[in-house]
């Protein structure tokens, strides 16, 4: 199935916009567009129609507004020396209206991803009805079963450093097309993935502008599901190596059972092959 049949007319209604606006979290950080989430929420009735019209126009033209491609980045201290910028994590604040429209259009896109298993069968993050507890239970129960039956277990765990910031936009668009995303909604996503600007903000003082590109941008609504679509085919080399997998966002767990008489060097060779296939 594809979304092409609905891509030229997605029923974006004012009642849908009203629902999204009403459900905004009042304590959500104010972004570069300046309207606070609390204001948008309290004015949901008056804003619903213009927001719905704006979403329709964006879909028709296939262009994400340039003013929504601006990020404020707040440095959040992690640990160690406070004067070392490497010890801070950047928290992205993006326009609240941008996220409202992402949720509006996401009403059609995200159910399509779920219905077509676009994230893969064993992705437990950002997926409806799944979570980290499910991933943990799946792993532990499988391993206990193998151990109970006298098997050895080979386990390889990996994650992608700075995952959201390492996504080739053109490659992601190709993958979405293969998954059946076409037409107007694909044009909007392609525009959404375009280059952005960011400024670091400290005590009301702004840094020089930096460019953001080839990312599924942090601080957005679409970032997590688009990452899942991008990372879905990472399981192919795992399966090729004879391993099973569970995935939680960018955390990939690969495991395989071996008879108790299989020597450790042979198991290590199998693990190294799995790692090599993943990195190739």
Where are the predicted features?
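Active-site palm subdomain of RNA-directed nucleic acid polymerases
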Residues: 105-123, 148, 224-261
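Surface-exposed loop/turn segments and immediately adjacent short secondary-structure elements
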Residues: 1-87, 99-100, 152
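Conserved catalytic palm subdomain of right-hand nucleotidyl-transferase polymerases, strongest
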Residues: 27-35, 73, 83-93, 133-177
């Amino acid at each position: 199935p594809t979304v092409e049949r609905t891509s030229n007319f997605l029923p974006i209604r004012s009642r849908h916009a009203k629902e999204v606006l009403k459900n905004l979290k009042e304590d959500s950080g104010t972004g570069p567009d300046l309207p606070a989430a609390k204001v948008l929420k309290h004015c949901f009735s008056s804003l619903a129609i213009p927001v719905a019209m704006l979403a329709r126009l964006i879909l028709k033209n296939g262009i994400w507004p340039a003013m929504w491609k601006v990020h404020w980045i707040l440095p959040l201290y992690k640990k160690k020396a406070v004067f070392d910028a490497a010890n801070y994590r950047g928290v992205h604040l993006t326009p609240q209206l941008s996220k409202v429209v992402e949720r509006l259009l996401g009403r059609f896109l995200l159910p399509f991803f779920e219905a077509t298993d676009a994230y893969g069968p064993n992705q437990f993050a950002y997926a409806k009805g799944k979570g980290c507890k499910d991933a943990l239970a799946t792993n532990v129960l499988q391993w206990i079963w193998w151990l109970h039956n006298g098997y050895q277990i080979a386990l390889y765990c990996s994650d992608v450093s700075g995952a959201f910031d390492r996504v080739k936009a053109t490659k992601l668009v190709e993958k979405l097309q293969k998954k059946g995303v076409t037409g107007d909604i694909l044009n909007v996503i392609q525009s959404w993935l375009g280059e952005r600007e960011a400024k670091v903000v400290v005590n009301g003082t702004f840094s020089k502008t930096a460019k953001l590109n080839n990312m599924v941008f942090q601080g957005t609504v679409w970032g997590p599901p688009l990452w899942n679509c991008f990372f879905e085919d990472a399981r192919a080399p795992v399966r090729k190596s004879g391993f099973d997998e569970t995935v939680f966002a960018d955390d990939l767990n690969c495991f395989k059972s071996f008879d108790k008489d299989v020597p450790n060097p042979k198991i290590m060779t199998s693990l190294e092959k799995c790692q090599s296939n993943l990195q190739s």
